[in-house]
Design a protein with these regions (language model features):
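Terminal amphipathic alpha-helical/low-complexity segments used for targeting or macromolecular assembly
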Residues: 1-29, 34, 62, 67-72
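Flexible, glycine/small-residue-enriched loop-and-beta-strand segment within the central core
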Residues: 19, 38-109
Length: 109
């Protein structure tokens, strides 16, 4: 329920600067620096694992993926030499002075 409330509030923000301010004021991300524009309307599943530096511009449609389940897929293909299904989770750190273009997918690691 809390996640839906956050996403609705992000939709109500006028622009990327407003969304970044909302994320910063409500301590939703792990870290968000100064002068950040966050244009996507979505958040990673584990938002606290996303860290944004100063002077960051994130275009619309960008997705941050903080987890993967490749072992899950391979295990059920009959390749039993892989470990049983495990959810792998990791942090994403975006440094200072970064621009991320539209519809990019950023993975952890």
């Amino acid at each position: 329920m809390k996640r839906i409330f956050i996403l609705l509030n992000m939709l109500l923000q006028k622009n990327g600067w407003g969304r970044a301010d909302y994320l910063r004021k409500n301590n939703i991300l792990g870290h968000i620096g100064k002068n950040v524009s966050y244009r996507p309307y979505n958040l990673p599943q584990e938002a606290k694992l996303l860290h944004l530096g100063d002077n960051v511009w994130i275009a619309a449609g960008v997705r941050f993926v903080t987890h993967d389940m490749i072992n899950h897929m391979l295990y059920f293909l009959g390749e039993k030499e892989f470990d049983p299904p495990i959810l792998h989770v990791g942090e994403i750190h975006i440094g200072n002075n970064v621009v991320i273009g539209s519809d990019s997918i950023i993975l952890y690691g």
